[in-house]
UniProtKB/Swiss-Prot annotation:
Record has Aminoacyl-tRNA synthetase as a keyword: no
Transit peptide interval: 1-39
Localization in the cell: Mitochondrion matrix
GO cellular component, one term: mitochondrial matrix
Function according to Swiss-Prot or TrEMBL: Essential component of the PAM complex, a complex required for the translocation of transit peptide-containing proteins from the inner membrane into the mitochondrial matrix in an ATP-dependent manner. Seems to control the nucleotide-dependent binding of mitochondrial HSP70 to substrate proteins. Binds ATP. Interacts with copper ions Cu(2+). Confers thermotolerance to long-term exposure at moderately high temperature (TMHT at 35 degrees Celsius).
GO molecular function terms noted in the UniProt entry: adenyl-nucleotide exchange factor activity; ATP binding; copper ion binding; protein homodimerization activity; protein-folding chaperone binding
Bias-annotated ranges (Acidic residues): 130-140
Name assigned to this protein: GrpE protein homolog 2, mitochondrial
Keyword Lyase recorded: no
Induction details: Induced by heat treatment at 38 degrees Celsius in a HSFA1-dependent manner (at protein level).
Region (Disordered): 68-140
């Protein structure tokens, strides 16, 4: 019974307070929008406050008369927090649903917020532009001149470096061409003169065949066939034919591989092609003429592999002309 009396008193006090607030609020000189808003807030607050007061009184009464409750103070605090959050969430909805606030006021609020955002963005962009302009203004004319001079100097250095590299490339290319030509020429010469040493070793064989052929011819010419009782003439003739055939075949092989024999009789002496072994006094020929050949010379293509061994005239027509000119 005591609990019911306390609860009835609390509800009566809350009703009186709400009626007083409703009576006193219109007396103030305010706009209808703000008065209605405040009235709704007060009404909501009174409705939220009454259950909270009742819950507090219930807990007080139960503690006064030693009654235990299943709810703890922590749960009461949680309830108060949740109720406060609900009231805070219901305030904007109540304000939006009030008849005093129309759509135009809402649009004005949103427009003002947008203008503030645009103003903030414009201020940020203007500040960045001013910073960039200040950075540009920091470079004076002298600094620009120095910067241009440095760039021109760097450009000239790069151009000189490019020029040197071009010259180096041209020199390298020319050297490479020379190396390629020299390599090609060496390869051709190696192939061309590969048989030089082998052919040079066969020159003595060719000389001996020539000497044998000349001796057999001389012996065969001196032989008297009428007094030849042993039959040596046919044998010498067969030997001569065999030697001559062998000599001819060897000469053909030499010619096939680029070797040629030359006999410089009655030619002017040439130290590149002739090797003077002795001198022959002969007034009928000009001085320095090849009068006698001991060994024939051989060439492999355009290269002399063995110069001819010759005898050169001495005291010929040139010496007589000198004597006449002196007289």
């Amino acid at each position: 019974m005591l609990v019911l009396r306390i609860l009835s008193r609390v509800t009566r006090n809350a009703g009186i307070r709400s009626s007083l607030s409703a009576v006193t609020l219109p007396a103030r000189n305010q706009t209808p929008v703000f008065s209605s808003r405040f009235h709704s807030l007060a009404h909501d607050f009174s409705h939220k406050l009454v259950p909270a007061q009742m819950s507090m009184m219930d807990s007080f009464a139960l503690q006064r008369f030693n009654f235990s409750s299943s709810t703890s103070p922590e749960s009461d605090e949680k309830k108060t927090h949740t109720e406060a959050s609900k009231t805070s969430e219901e305030k904007p909805t109540a304000e939006a649903n009030q008849p005093g606030l129309d759509s135009e006021s809402k649009d004005s609020v949103t427009d003002s917020a947008k203008r503030k955002r645009k103003g903030a963005k414009g201020a940020a962009s203007s500040s960045s532009e001013s910073d960039s302009e200040s950075d540009d203004d920091e470079l004076s004319a002298d600094d620009l001149v120095k910067l241009v001079a440095e760039k021109e100097e760097l450009l000239s250095e790069k151009e000189e470096e490019i020029k040197q590299l071009k010259d180096k490339v041209l020199r390298t290319y020319a050297e490479m061409e020379n190396v390629m030509d020299r390599t090609r020429r060496d390869a051709e010469n190696t192939k061309k003169y590969a048989v030089q040493n082998f052919a040079k070793s066969l020159l003595d064989v060719a000389d001996n065949l020539g000497r044998a052929s000349s001796v057999v011819k001389e012996s065969f010419s001196k032989l008297d066939t009428s007094e030849d009782s042993a039959g040596a003439a046919p044998l010498l003739k067969t030997l001569l034919e065999g030697v001559e055939m062998t000599e001819k075949q060897l000469a053909e092989v030499f010619k096939k591989f680029g070797m040629e024999k030359y006999d410089p009789i009655n030619e002017p002496f040439d130290p590149n092609r002739h090797n003077a072994v002795f001198q022959v006094p002969d007034a009928s020929k000009p001085e320095g003429t090849v009068a006698h050949v001991l060994k024939s010379g051989y060439t492999l293509y355009d290269r002399v592999i063995r110069p001819a061994e010759v005898g050169v005239t001495q005291g010929g027509e040139n010496q007589e002309e000198k004597k006449e000119s002196d007289a």
